[in-house]
Amino acid sequence: ISRSTFLSWLGLAAGGTLFGSLLYGYSNKYNYHVKRIQLAYDNLPAAFKGLKIVHISDIHSGSFTDKKAVAHGVEKILNEKADLILFTGDLVNDRTSEMEEYMDVFNKLNAPLGVYSTLGNHDYGDYVRWPYNGITKEQNLESLKKVHADMGWKLLMNEHVVLEKGGAEIALLGIENWSNKARFPKHGRMDLAHAGADKYPFKILMSHDPSHWDAQVKPNYPDVDLTLSGHTHGMQFGIEIPGFKWSPVQYIYKQWA
């Protein structure tokens, strides 16, 4: 076999692998997996022992094509009977209108301590032209905030709330998108979210981009006990089999999924 023929076949195989992986990721977007992680903290108040959190992220509703399958995913979340549900951004790909068909699905999410959310880089509408159908970029963002509220989700915008259980209190912080990568928006304000939270013995942070943790949270806010992020799903492109896990996003982000 000649060198040129070999390289042609090699290129074809590589392209086929890439396309196959993308197709697999797209076709399996409703193949939900629940990953269970147990954490232990000495400073978590006794009243919160056994606290169960369901963490979801990167819904990207504009990519959905099967409402019934989406509803099944919500059912799986509800079946977990969590104390608290946290969503860490990217509700849409670009526009709030993507959520119109799915609001009556996601508004079913509920938990005793509430459903809280933050914004991700896609939620700001930075990747499409505006105005669109007479709607400006600013109006789109405001309508997206309203969608969170209408679904019963408390959107945290550089602020914190206090969670109370059995007379004990912990702080839940949520910030807007903050990335250590220059190409992504940096609207998050940890100083605002953390202000007044010092007195609580345990703090959970919701921040869409995990690069925020190494760059700012770990060095400047060491009293944050748990940070939950999304973002690094790499367009669902990757391979995960027993004993092996790979995605191109791992070469960009230290923390990835």
Enumerate the predicted regions with their spans.
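Short N-terminal helix-initiation segments at or just after the protein's N-terminus
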Residues: 2, 27-30, 204-209
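N-terminal secretory signal peptides and thylakoid transit peptides that target proteins
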Residues: 2-14
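Generic detector of short, well-ordered, non-transmembrane alpha-helical segments enriched
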Residues: 2-3, 35, 151
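Single-pass alpha-helical transmembrane signal-anchor segments
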Residues: 12-26
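Aromatic-capped interface at the extracytoplasmic side
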Residues: 23-36
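Soluble catalytic domains of enzymes that build or remodel membrane lipids, polysaccharides, and related
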Residues: 44-257
